[in-house]
């Protein structure tokens, strides 16, 4: 049939919450696992994306993919280069199973750190304790991890903030010091306990986000993405920090760097991102507001490149409430 179909997102930070930057086209009838011609594509971009599929009057299909142009007009200086995201695709004559395996092989070889090596298994405390834990509970869970034979214990949300202790998701996000009441001996006590038990220690962070009830928000409200003439709209009681701002990039890098400097035995980071961008406005960008969606992603990439350069052997997972970003 003639016409156009668009798959896109405008959520900013947690861009993939409702759809993924991925498509699968069957070219000779409905695709099956082991037969049929299949084209599979995805986009190397962590922000807003758009896939447009259009069939013309000659029954020819055009696929246009890239950064979503929504609210993203971008002005360039003379001779400035704008690099568009990479488009990755594979073609299979033997069904969607082979196309999937092609992507897995490519990702392991070229994209994922140590992709062809075995992955660590872990025990995460989140659904065992949620925010209600102390040192004794965590050490007991480490014993369970040892008994299960997993490689690592991962401490999830709830370990930080003191003025507004992280007793729930309504406060503390942005204040990355251990909560003294929960962890009087600090993260170092836990990394040492894990080491003695023969397992590794990982930790949860969400450095791109902030609760309004936090010391960070009180000190740096200008770092927060929000419209000054609108009521703030919260997703999981939080807002998104403005990663187009180099000072915010330094702060976000510092969350990882400070923890690694103090506790070099941390072996893994679970980097969360639970909120889309709402009421979008950047104090930093001033009259270039249409740059924000793009410069946010570039700022994130800059931070991750800095982390990779300083800690090249440190594995990280960007989970975003599950598969909410790529």
Segments from the language model and where they lie:
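N-terminal accessory beta-strand-rich subdomains and adjacent acidic, glycine-rich linkers
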Residues: 1-106
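Short, flexible loop/turn elements at secondary-structure junctions
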Residues: 45, 80, 127, 159, ...
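Structured core elements
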Residues: 75, 83, 122, 152-154, ...
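Long, charged amphipathic helices and adjacent flexible linkers at domain junctions
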Residues: 103-121
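Flexible hinge/switch segments at interdomain interfaces of large molecular machines
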Residues: 113-117, 161, 225-232
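Short, well-ordered coil/turn segments that N-cap beta-strands
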Residues: 115-121, 149-151, 195-201, 265-267, ...
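Aromatic- and glycine-enriched glycan-recognition loops and surfaces
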Residues: 125, 129-218, 224, 247-254, ...
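Active-site neighborhood of glycoside hydrolase catalytic domains
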Residues: 179-186, 192-196, 218-326
């Amino acid at each position: 049939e003639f016409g156009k179909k668009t798959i896109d997102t405008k959520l900013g930070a947690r861009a993939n919450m409702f759809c993924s930057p991925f498509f699968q086209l069957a070219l000779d009838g409905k695709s099956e696992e082991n037969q049929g011609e299949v084209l599979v594509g995805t986009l190397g971009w962590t922000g807003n994306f758009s896939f447009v599929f259009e069939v013309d009057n000659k029954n020819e299909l055009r696929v246009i993919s890239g950064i979503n142009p929504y609210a993203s007009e971008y002005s360039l200086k003379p001779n400035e280069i704008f690099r568009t995201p990479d488009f990755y695709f594979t073609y299979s004559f033997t069904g969607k199973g082979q196309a999937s395996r092609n992507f897995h092989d490519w990702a392991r070889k070229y994209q994922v750190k140590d992709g062809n090596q075995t992955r660590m298994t872990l025990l995460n405390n989140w659904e065992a304790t949620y925010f209600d834990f102390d040192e004794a509970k965590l050490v007991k869970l480490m014993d369970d991890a040892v008994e299960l034979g997993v490689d690592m214990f991962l401490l999830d949300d709830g370990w930080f903030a003191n003025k507004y202790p992280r007793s729930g998701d309504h406060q503390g996000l942005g204040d990355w010091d251990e909560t003294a009441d929960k962890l009087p001996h600090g993260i170092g006590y836990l990394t040492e306990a894990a080491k003695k038990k023969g397992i590794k220690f990982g930790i949860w962070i969400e450095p791109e986000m902030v609760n309004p009830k936090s010391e960070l928000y009180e000190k740096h409200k200008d770092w927060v993405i929000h419209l000054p003439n609108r009521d703030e709209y919260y997703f999981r009681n939080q807002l998104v920090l403005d990663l187009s701002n180099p000072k915010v990039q330094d702060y976000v890098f510092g969350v990882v760097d400070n923890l690694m400097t103090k506790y070099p035995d941390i072996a893994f980071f679970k980097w969360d991102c639970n909120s889309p961008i709402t009421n979008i406005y950047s104090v930093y960008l001033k009259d270039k507001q249409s740059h924000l969606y793009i410069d946010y992603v570039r700022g994130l990439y800059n931070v991750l490149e800095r982390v990779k350069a300083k800690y090249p052997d440190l594995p990280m997972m960007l989970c975003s409430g599950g598969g909410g970003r790529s």
